[in-house]
Amino acid sequence: MMTPTRQLLLLAALLLGLSSCKHNATTPQDAFSIDILPKKKEYHLGDTLQISIHHPRFEGSVQQTSYQIHQQPVTTLGDKIVLENLLLGKQFLSVSVQTNDGKQDTVKKPLLILAQHTPKLLSYRILNEYPHDKEAYTQGLEFIGDTLVESTGQYKQSSIRKWNPFTEEVYQNVPLQPIYFGEGATVFRGKILQLTWRENIGFVYDQQLKVVKTFAYGKSKEGWGLCHNGTDKLYKSDGTEKIWLLHPETFAEIDSLQLCTDKSLYTYANELEFANGKIYANTFLKDGIMIINPENGAIEGVVDVRGLKDKVEKTPDVDVLNGIAYHPIRHTFFITGKNWSKIFEVVFLPND
């Protein structure tokens, strides 16, 4: 049985090296200022904070005070607020004051909100191994029935393909133009979406892998991973601490999650998969898979998948873990990597 201390060290090994981010925004000043107690560099979901208003530069008495974080009302208990049902990461507490003479002023103060709990550590068990094209620099992986849709990368080598891991039959394999570096892919509302890395463009294909539409990125500068929740939410990673929510029809970036443990913000969520109500993210340059709460960005678990790469053919091109697809009928995950000769069917297990 793994001790709590060893679990924390292993979590650090699987996540460490991902750039944690500091909140360095300034506090806007208006007709009043606010103090937050306790004074801390970071807070956690579930914390209760006491808010006091100082140095009012307006006439009249305060009649009403309201609080928001990320345009969402915050639970209040008198002069206290409770950090619950909120997005994590670098946020702003917005305090609005209305006086008895009808005037209203608002100030904002930055808050760093982290997850409430330490991520759970999970392991894996291999059920089956299947051949995988060792020339495929895997960037995206998702099932349609028993067919895998796979996006591959590298300039002059990128492609979008459909193949069956059980029969090894390749149904279609369409190369991208040499100027594009293929990235994550997902199957959404009958269409196949594929990102590119730094070309600021995504492709929308029909089931015959013909391009029917393209879309541009917004604030994000790169395309990494892509998945959806099965109904109306698309998620896109870009290598930063953010996972972007895309509009289900235009694919424009409309909001974002920030990835947090109870210790820090984290970056480098790579290829994405949505399964069982969670986002599963390959961690770039690490043998770990993050399990992310799509409602707030909390990293709730980390799957230690060390050892898989040791089981593939050692070639000069073999690269990092990347590629995770959930088979909803078999209730298993299929995992591979860039230029790996195998794809592994696994289940994840609690690390008791």
What are these regions (language model features)?
Residues 114-135, 165-171:
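A short helix->beta-strand "capping" segment at the edge of beta-propeller domains
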Residues 127-159, 173-186, 337-339:
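Beta-strand-rich domains and repeat architectures in extracellular enzymes and scaffolds
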